[in-house]
Curated annotation (Swiss-Prot):
Keyword Phosphoprotein: yes
Sequence intervals crossing the membrane: none
Amino acid composition bias (Basic residues), ranges on this chain: 90-101, 634-644
Lineage of producing organism: Eukaryota, Metazoa, Chordata, Craniata, Vertebrata
Task performed by this protein: May constitute a novel regulatory system for basal transcription. Negatively regulates ABT1.
Superkingdom to which the source organism belongs: Eukaryota
Protein name listed in UniProt: ESF1 homolog
Length: 845
C-alpha cells in the first residue's frame, strides 16, 4: 500500500487516477448478467472441471467455476436468490467440515475401543467356562427327563402335562431368585464384577438355548428301541420345547435390561452419529442432482425402473441376436514385433475394388528419396480359399441364414450381410516388396492406419519376416505404374461406409463396366484388335515346341490337315495386317497434309500444257492481256467458219430417201458426187500430215476456249452490296431471293495472275483480318489461302536449297536443278486446271 501511495503521490503518475484511459472496467460492465435458470453452473459438479496444467505445461490448481465467476454474474432480480443459495452452500460446507472432524475423532477412538473389547472378551471367556459345566448338566437332565416322557405320553398324556407345568414353575422360581438376589442399583454401574455377572448370565442363557434347540430334535427323532415316534408325541415334545424356549427368553430379557442400562449412553451416541451420517449422505445425493431437474441430454432422469413393464416388453419383443463388428479393430489380434524387414503385408482392404496398381501408386507417392518399391502382389488367404470354395457351391453362408420373406429394412439381416462383408476383407492380402527395410519402415509410418482416398477402408500394414515364402499364384501383380496416366479410384466400402449394406459377392467387376462404357479412339481399337486376333510368330513357335514328343507319331493325314489350316490362318493374318497398314498410312498422310487437295489430270490437257510451255519459251506469252484477248477472238472466228464449211459439205453429201437411182439423170449425178469424193479423199490423203498438226492445234485452242467461255459473261458488281448480303440472315436472304434482289458473290479471283504476285510477297499489301475495314468474302478467303501456300512453298524451297548446298559440298559432280521459272510455270498450270474443274462442277450444279 505504501508503494502504491508513493506512486500516486509522484507527480509523473498523478494523472493515472484521473485519466479514464487508465481506469479499470467496473465489475458490472465486465461480467455478463445471466438468468437464475443458469445459476447451477456456479456450484453444480457437471460444470466443474479441474485443470492440472496450463497451456504451457506448468502445473496449476484451477477450475472452470473460477472462469465462470470471472465472466458471468446473476442479474439484479436474482441476486436475493443467489444470497440464499450462498447461505445454503455455506451450511453445506460447515456440515462437511463437521463430518471430517467426526471421522478424525472416530479414527482416534477406534484403537481405544478395540482395547476395551479385548479386555471384555477375556472376562467373558472366564465366565463362559464357569457356566459351561452348569449348562452341560442341565442338558443331560433334560435328556433324561424327556426320555420317560415320550414313553408316558404314549400311555397317558395328561400326566405329562401336569409334570411339565410343575417343572416350569420350579424353573421360574429359580430365575426370579437369581434376579432378585442382585441389587437393582448395581445393574447400571460400570464395575467389572457386575458387568461380568450380567454378561456371563446372558451368554450362558443364549448358549443353553442353542444347545436345547439342537439336542431336542435329536432326542425326539428316535426311541430307545430305535423306532420313529408317533405324530402326537412329536407335537407334544415340540410344544414343550417351545415353552422352555419362551421361559429362557424371558430370562434373557431381564438380563438384557441390565445390559442396556449399562451400555445405554454408548448406544445413544452411536445412533445419533448414524442419523447424522445418513442425513449427510442424503444431502450429498441431493447435491449431485442438478437444480434444473433431470438432465436428459446427459442420460439422467430418463431411465424407467419399472421391472414389470420391462418384462411385458420382453415378452412382446424378444431379444434380437447381437452383432459385434470389428470397427477399426481388425488388427487387434495381430502380433507385435520389433523386427523391420523390406517386405510389407497389406491386410483388411476392399479387394473387390482395389488392384495391385492402386497400392503401388500409393506406396510410390510415400516412398523416401532413393527408395524403390519393386512390386505389389495380391495373394488369396487360406481363409479366403475355403470360403470361396464354399461360395462356388452354395453361395455365402450368411445369405442362407436370412429368410426369403425377410423385409429389406430388417436390422438382423442387414447386420448379417455387414458381417459377411467384414469377413470378405480377409479373403486376400497384398505383399509389397521394397529395396530396403528403411523404405518399408517409412511407408509403414506414413501409411499404416491411413484411409485410402474416401473409401472408409483403412490400410493395415504388417512386416513380413524374411524366411516366409509364398507358393500360391498371385491374383494380381503390378511392377510399374505410369503416374501421369494413372487415375485414382473413388469408392466407399460396402461394409464400413454406409448404413445400408450392399453385398459384393455376385457384383460385376467395376473396371469391366468402366471399360465397356468408355469411348475408345481409333488407335486404341486397332491395338485391341491386334491383341485379340493376331498372335506373334514367336508364340506360334513356342506352342509347337511345347507339344509333347509322344504325339509326333500320330496320323500323318491329320498333321497335313493341321499344317494347311495353319497356313491358311497365316495367310489371312498377313492380308489383314496389310489392310491395316494401308489404312494407317492413309490416316498418317491425311494428318500430315493439313490442306487436303485432290488433283485430277484430264486426258488431252497434257498436250495443251506442253504447247503453253513451248509458247512461253518462244516468247508468245509476252503479249499484253489485250493482245491475247484479240487473238483469242480471231481464233474463235476461224473455228466458227471451219465448222460452217464442214456442215455445208455434210448437207451436200446427204441425198433424199425418195431418189430413184435407176433414173439416168440421178445416176449421172451420183457418179459426179462419187468423183468429187474421190478427189476430196486424194486431197485429204495428201494433206493428212498437215491436218494432223492442225488438229492438234485445234484441240489446244478448244481447251483454251473452254477455259475462257465464262469470260464472255463478265459483268459489273457492287462490292458493298455483296458484303451486305453475305452478312444477312437466312430469312432475309430468302426474302431477297423472292424479290430477285439478292446479289450472289459469283466473282472468282485469278489468284495465279502474275500482275498481282506482289500481294503475296510484299508487306505493303498484307491483309489484316483484325482490321475493322476487313470484309470477309470468298475472294478474300482465296487470297489468304494463296498467301499461305506461297509461304509453304518458300519454306520448301529454302529447305531444298539447304539440302542442295549440303549435297553440293559433299558431291560437287551432281546435275544442276531445274529452272525455277519452269517449276513455277508448272505449278500455275496445275492451279488453272484446278480452277477449271471447280467451274465445271458449278456448271453441273
Amino acid at each position: 500500500m505504501s508503494s502504491k501511495q508513493e506512486i500516486m503521490d509522484d507527480q509523473r503518475f498523478r494523472r493515472v487516477s484521473k485519466d479514464p484511459r487508465f481506469w479499470e472496467m467496473p465489475e458490472k460492465e465486465r461480467k455478463v448478467k445471466i438468468d437464475k435458470r443458469f445459476r447451477a453452473m456456479f456450484h453444480d459438479k457437471k460444470f466443474k472441471l479441474n485443470y492440472a496444467v496450463d497451456k504451457r505445461g506448468r502445473p496449476i490448481s484451477h477450475s472452470t467455476t473460477e472462469d465462470l465467476k470471472r465472466f458471468y454474474d446473476l442479474s439484479d432480480s436474482d441476486s436475493d436468490l443467489s444470497d440464499e443459495e450462498s447461505k445454503i452452500l455455506s451450511q453445506k460446507k460447515a456440515k462437511q467440515k463437521k463430518k471430517q472432524t467426526k471421522k478424525e475423532a472416530k479414527s482416534i477412538e477406534k484403537p481405544i475401543e478395540e482395547k476395551k473389547k479385548e479386555t471384555k472378551k477375556t472376562d467373558q471367556k472366564d465366565s463362559i467356562n464357569k457356566h459351561d459345566l452348569n449348562n452341560s448338566e442341565r442338558v443331560q437332565k433334560m435328556k433324561n427327563s424327556q426320555k420317560p416322557q415320550k414313553i408316558d405320553s404314549e400311555i397317558s398324556p395328561k400326566k405329562d402335562n401336569e409334570e411339565f407345568l410343575q417343572n416350569k414353575k420350579k424353573k421360574r422360581g429359580t430365575t426370579d431368585l437369581s434376579v432378585e438376589a442382585l441389587p437393582k442399583g448395581k445393574l447400571r454401574t460400570k464395575d467389572s464384577s457386575t458387568s461380568e455377572m450380567v454378561k456371563s448370565s446372558t451368554m450362558s442363557s443364549s448358549k443353553a438355548k442353542r444347545e436345547k434347540q439342537s439336542v431336542v430334535p435329536v432326542i425326539m427323532a428316535k426311541d430307545n428301541d430305535g423306532k420313529m415316534p408317533d405324530e402326537d408325541a412329536l407335537e407334544e415334545d415340540s410344544d414343550s420345547a417351545s415353552e422352555l424356549g419362551s421361559d429362557e427368553e424371558s430370562e434373557d430379557e431381564i438380563i438384557s435390561d441390565g445390559k442396556t442400562s449399562a451400555d445405554e449412553d454408548e448406544s445413544e451416541e452411536e445412533d445419533e452419529e448414524e442419523e447424522e451420517d445418513s442425513e449427510e449422505e442424503e444431502e450429498e445425493e441431493e447435491e449431485d442432482e442438478s437444480d434444473s431437474g433431470p438432465d436428459l441430454a446427459r442420460g439422467k432422469g430418463n431411465v424407467e425402473t419399472s421391472s414389470e413393464d420391462e418384462d411385458d416388453l420382453a415378452d412382446l419383443f424378444p431379444e434380437e441376436p447381437g452383432f459385434e463388428h470389428a470397427w477399426r479393430e481388425l488388427d487387434k489380434d495381430a502380433p507385435r514385433a520389433d523386427e523391420i524387414t523390406r517386405r510389407l503385408a497389406v491386410c483388411n482392404m476392399d479387394w473387390d475394388r482395389l488392384k495391385a496398381k492402386d497400392l503401388l501408386a500409393l506406396f510410390n507417392s510415400f516412398k523416401p528419396k532413393g527408395g524403390v518399391v519393386f512390386s505389389v502382389k495380391i495373394y488369396p488367404s487360406e481363409f479366403g480359399k475355403e470360403r470361396m470354395k464354399e461360395e462356388q457351391v452354395q453361395g455365402p453362408v450368411e445369405l442362407l441364414s436370412i429368410p426369403e420373406d425377410a423385409p429389406e429394412k430388417d436390422w438382423a439381416s442387414r447386420e448379417k450381410l455387414r458381417d459377411y462383408q467384414f469377413k470378405r476383407l480377409k479373403y486376400y492380402y497384398a505383399v509389397a516388396e521394397c529395396d530396403s527395410p528403411e523404405t518399408a519402415s517409412k511407408i509403414y509410418e506414413d501409411c499404416d492406419g491411413l484411409e485410402f482416398e474416401s473409401s472408409c477402408s483403412f490400410i493395415d500394414l504388417r512386416f513380413i519376416p524374411d524366411d516366409i515364402t509364398f507358393d500360391d499364384e498371385p491374383k494380381d501383380v503390378a511392377l510399374e505404374v505410369d503416374l501421369t496416366a494413372y487415375k485414382p479410384k473413388y469408392f466407399t466400402s460396402a461394409a464400413m461406409g454406409t448404413s445400408t449394406v450392399e453385398i459384393t459377392w455376385d457384383e460385376t467387376d467395376h473396371e469391366r463396366i468402366t471399360t465397356l462404357n468408355r469411348k475408345f479412339k481409333k488407335d486404341e481399337l486397332l491395338d485391341m484388335d491386334f491383341q485379340a486376333y493376331l498372335a506373334s510368330s514367336s508364340e506360334d513357335e513356342e506352342e509347337v515346341e511345347e507339344a509333347p514328343e509322344g504325339e509326333e507319331g500320330v496320323n500323318i493325314g491329320e498333321d497335313g490337315k493341321t499344317k494347311k489350316s495353319q497356313k491358311d490362318d497365316e495367310e489371312q493374318i498377313a492380308k489383314y495386317r496389310q489392310l491395316l497398314q494401308v489404312i494407317q498410312e492413309k490416316e498418317k498422310k491425311g494428318k500430315e497434309n493439313d490442306m487436303e487437295m485432290e488433283i485430277k489430270w484430264v486426258p488431252g490437257l497434257k498436250e495443251s500444257a506442253e504447247e503453253m510451255v513451248k509458247n512461253k519459251l518462244e516468247g508468245k506469252d509476252k503479249l499484253t492481256p489485250w493482245e491475247q484477248f484479240l487473238e483469242k477472238k480471231k481464233e474463235k472466228k476461224r473455228l466458227k467458219k471451219k465448222q460452217k464449211a464442214l456442215a455445208e459439205e455434210d448437207s451436200e453429201d446427204e441425198l433424199p430417201s425418195d431418189v430413184d437411182f435407176n433414173d439416168p439423170y440421178f445416176a449421172e449425178e451420183v457418179k459426179k458426187i462419187g468423183i468429187k469424193k474421190k478427189s476430196m479423199k486424194s486431197a485429204k490423203d495428201s494433206a493428212s500430215s498437215e491436218e494432223e498438226t492442225d488438229l492438234e492445234k485445234q484441240k489446244a485452242e478448244m481447251a483454251l476456249l473452254v477455259m475462257d467461255e465464262e469470260e464472255d459473261s463478265k459483268k459489273h458488281f457492287n462490292y458493298d452490296k455483296i458484303v451486305e448480303h453475305q452478312n444477312l440472315s437466312k430469312k432475309k436472304k430468302k426474302q431477297l431471293m423472292k424479290k430477285k434482289e439478292l446479289v450472289e458473290d459469283d466473282f472468282e479471283v485469278n489468284v495465279s495472275d502474275a500482275r498481282f504476285q506482289a500481294m503475296y510477297t510484299s508487306h505493303l499489301f498484307n491483309l489484316d483480318p483484325s482490321d475493322p475495314n476487313f470484309k470477309k468474302t470468298k475472294a478474300m478467303e482465296k487470297i489468304l489461302e494463296e498467301k499461305a501456300r506461297h509461304r509453304e512453298r518458300k519454306e520448301e524451297l529454302l529447305i531444298q536449297a539447304v539440302e542442295r548446298a549440303q549435297q553440293d559440298t559433299g558431291k560437287p559432280t551432281q546435275k544442276q536443278p531445274m529452272d525455277p521459272a519452269l517449276s513455277m510455270l508448272i505449278k500455275s498450270v496445275k492451279n488453272k486446271t484446278e480452277q477449271f474443274q471447280a467451274r465445271k462442277k458449278q456448271r453441273v450444279k
